[in-house]
Curated annotation (Swiss-Prot):
It comes from Encephalitozoon cuniculi (strain GB-M1) (Microsporidian parasite). ATP binds at G176, P177, P178, G179, T180, G181, K182, T183. GO terms for cellular component: cytoplasm; nucleus; proteasome regulatory particle, base subcomplex. GO terms for molecular function: ATP binding; ATP hydrolysis activity. This is 26S proteasome regulatory subunit 8 homolog. SMART domains: AAA. The 26S proteasome consists of a 20S proteasome core and two 19S regulatory subunits. The 20S proteasome core is composed of 28 subunits that are arranged in four stacked rings, resulting in a barrel-shaped structure. The two end rings are each formed by seven alpha subunits, and the two central rings are each formed by seven beta subunits. The catalytic chamber with the active sites is on the inside of the barrel. Belongs to the AAA ATPase family. Acts as a regulatory subunit of the 26S proteasome which degrades poly-ubiquitinated proteins in the cytoplasm and in the nucleus. It is essential for the regulated turnover of proteins and for the removal of misfolded proteins. The proteasome is a multicatalytic proteinase complex that is characterized by its ability to cleave peptides with Arg, Phe, Tyr, Leu, and Glu adjacent to the leaving group at neutral or slightly basic pH. The keyword Nucleus applies. Gene3D superfamilies: 1.10.8.60, Nucleic acid-binding proteins, P-loop containing nucleotide triphosphate hydrolases. InterPro entries: 26S_Proteasome_ATPase (IPR050221), AAA+_ATPase (IPR003593), AAA_lid_3 (IPR041569), ATPase_AAA_core (IPR003959), ATPase_AAA_CS (IPR003960), NA-bd_OB-fold (IPR012340), P-loop_NTPase (IPR027417), Prot_ATP_ID_OB_2nd (IPR032501).
Length: 392
């Protein structure tokens, strides 16, 4: 009996010790994880300390290559220095305007720095090229021809201008009433040229603080040079390019500074850099003459309201994928839309489809188009007539 009691006692004791061992093992694993985390933090802090203890570098901008692994750099506020380039730096990448790091003691170039660009400017670049094509634009054959000569031809075939001995055009201005296809044509140009497309609205360049708008314009053209060939599309240019007056308001003077920086950039960059500028506005009458002069804007393309044949072509384009009943007379519909813009013609097709959906039909009838014309003209007729009178 005593033997059985001792056996049970030690058996329970062993079970208790095994439970304690399992708990201690679990605690040990947690402590090992904490130790590993602390060791990682110690290594990170040691690396930071070593980085902080390293000698600092000065930032400079390359002005010109001088040969034999030497470049002329500009530093603020010291001035310009002729410095050596360390063997680890790619000498071919050192071009004018590139930011470099200089040793604090010897001023040798030891690293190439990335270009400093404002995040707001980086967001202006359209990564995905628009899928608009010239076939999706109706009634603008002459405008398409003119903009292709100024923008697309110099980018795709610059040798033609070199053989003729003429300078490439720098920019083009698209002007006309709202809804006549200015932005749509700019998207189509970006699609067919297959180059970087940078879109910016003029109101985005109007900033609160002095000098911010000018800085955005400078960095916008810097980014365009880095990603050349590129197209800068500036919509609503009248917000910063209006005629200068004698106003002493701070807001007006800041807008004028932004426009002066834009004029400087248009004069500064070379035409063979594959940077083209497209500007669009509804109010060409208020633009400053300095912005419109030849050499900055080489061609001005007018976008008038479409005539009857152009409206018919636009109707055919936007109704191409619609499920239409037989016998629809698009010519009659186009003749009823006198003075309408291309955007209003597209709105008629959309409204006609909405009338068909309202009656649970899968096809669009002639009556749907007629009701859509009546609705669109009733909704926008008075407003657009006032705008056209203003633009005359």
């Amino acid at each position: 009996m005593a033997e059985g009691f001792c056996k049970n006692f030690y058996s329970n004791k062993l079970d208790h010790l095994e439970v304690q061992i399992a708990k201690k093992t679990k605690i040990l694993r947690v402590l090992e994880q904490k130790r590993a985390e602390l060791n990682r933090r110690v290594r990170f802090l040691r690396e930071e300390i070593s980085i902080v203890q390293e000698p600092s570098s000065n930032v400079g901008v390359v002005v010109e290559k001088m040969g034999k692994m030497q470049v002329l750099v500009k530093t603020n506020p010291d001035g310009k220095y002729l410095v050596k380039v360390e063997p680890g730096v790619n000498y071919d990448e050192l071009k004018a305007g590139v930011r470099v790091a200089l040793r604090s003691d010897s001023y040798d170039v030891h690293r190439i720095l990335p270009t400093k660009v404002d995040p707001l400017v980086s967001l202006m670049m359209v990564e995905k090229v628009p899928d608009s094509t010239y076939q999706m634009i109706g009634g603008l054959d002459e405008q398409i021809k003119e903009i292709r000569e100024v923008i697309e031809l110099p980018i795709k075939h610059p040798e033609l201008f070199e053989n003729l001995g003429i300078a490439q055009p720098k920019g083009v201005l698209l002007y006309g009433p709202p809804g006549t296809g200015k932005t749509l044509l700019a998207r189509a140009v970006a699609h067919h040229t297959q180059c970087k497309f940078i879109r910016v609205s003029g109101s985005e360049l109007v900033q609160k603080y002095i000098g911010e708008g000018s800085r955005l314009v400078r960095e916008l053209f810097i980014m365009a040079r880095e990603h050349a060939p590129s197209i800068i599309f500036m919509d609503e240019i009248d917000s910063i390019g209006s005629t200068r007056g004698d106003s002493n308001k701070g807001s007006d003077s800041e807008v004028q500074r932004t426009m002066l920086e834009l004029l400087n950039q248009l004069d500064g960059f070379e035409s063979h850099n594959n940077i083209k500028v497209i500007m669009a506005t509804n109010r060409i009458d208020i633009l400053d003459p300095a912005l419109l002069r030849t050499g900055r804007i080489d061609r001005k393309i007018e976008f008038p309201p479409p005539n009857e044949s152009a409206r018919l072509e636009i109707l055919k384009i936007h109704s191409r994928k619609m499920n239409l009943t037989k016998g629809i007379d698009l010519e009659t519909i186009a003749s009823k839309m006198v003075g309408c813009s291309g955007a209003e013609v597209k709105a008629v097709c959309t409204e006609a489809g909405m009338y068909a959906l309202r009656e649970r039909r899968v096809h669009v009838t002639q009556e749907d188009f007629e009701m859509a014309v009546h609705k669109v003209l009733k909704k926008t007729g008075d407003l657009n007539s006032d705008l056209r009178k203003l633009l005359k």
